[in-house]
Regions:
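A Lys-centered signature of the CheY-like receiver
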Residues: 39
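"A position-specific structural signal for the A-helix of alpha-solenoid helical repeats
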Residues: 61, 95-96, 129, 163
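Start-of-helix register in tetratricopeptide repeats
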Residues: 57, 91-92, 125, 159
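Flexible loop/N-cap segments at domain edges
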Residues: 108-191
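Receiver (REC) domain switch/output surface
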Residues: 46-57, 62
Length: 191
């Protein structure tokens, strides 16, 4: 719904499910959800999660408004400012900002922001982002090294295999890419 621009960013969008498998959680994380709530849950847990998600929406409203206006440059700039000032939800803003920078083709800036996130906190999504920026800037071999390190830390990180396969294709290593994509599909069979 978000990708089709049918659901505004100001709307809090949660998935409520009894499915707790890694594949289901990974698939939900790839979608544009604000949260994932496992059943059973208490009313107070639901209230707390929705309240926190709504608070995040309020803090990041200028960023979401810029995205909805297709002003990705402004949105990326607002994300970088929030990250640098360590304002509330600075890591969340950095994640949005890096995606916007990649979309805008500003790969070096995206990589710099990903690396700043890693320096602040070693988060897997930031390391994955460094690899994506490396591929986009023609450094597929360096991306493979980055991704192999990430997979070494967490062999169940399906997105890392997906990006690794892309890097292998870029280098013409098609048989390796097929095996890598096979591993990714085994980790997330329902996606």
């Amino acid at each position: 719904l978000r990708r089709a621009q049918l659901l505004p960013f100001s709307t809090v969008f949660f998935m409520v499910t009894a499915e707790a498998s890694y594949a289901a959680v990974a698939e939900a994380a790839e979608s544009a959800l604000d949260g994932y709530l496992l059943k059973p849950f208490t009313p107070s847990a639901l209230f707390e999660r929705l309240s926190l998600a709504r608070l995040r929406k309020v803090h990041l409203k200028p960023i979401f408004d810029a995205i909805e206006q297709d002003d990705f440059k402004l949105a990326a700039s607002l994300c970088a400012e929030r990250f640098e000032a360590r304002q509330p939800y600075w890591l969340y803003a950095a994640r949005i900002g890096t995606e916007l920078l990649l979309r805008l083709g500003r790969h070096a800036e995206a990589r710099t922001l990903f690396e700043a996130v890693i320096a602040a906190r070693a988060l897997p999504w930031a390391k994955l982002g460094v690899a994506r920026a490396q591929i986009e800037s023609g450094q597929a071999q360096r991306a493979i090294t980055t991704l192999q390190g990430l997979i070494g830390e967490d062999a169940s990180f399906a997105d890392a295999y997906d990006v690794l396969g892309r890097a292998q294709v870029e280098l013409g290593h098609f048989s390796e890419a097929i095996e890598t994509y096979r591993t990714a599909s085994e980790l997330t069979p329902d996606s």
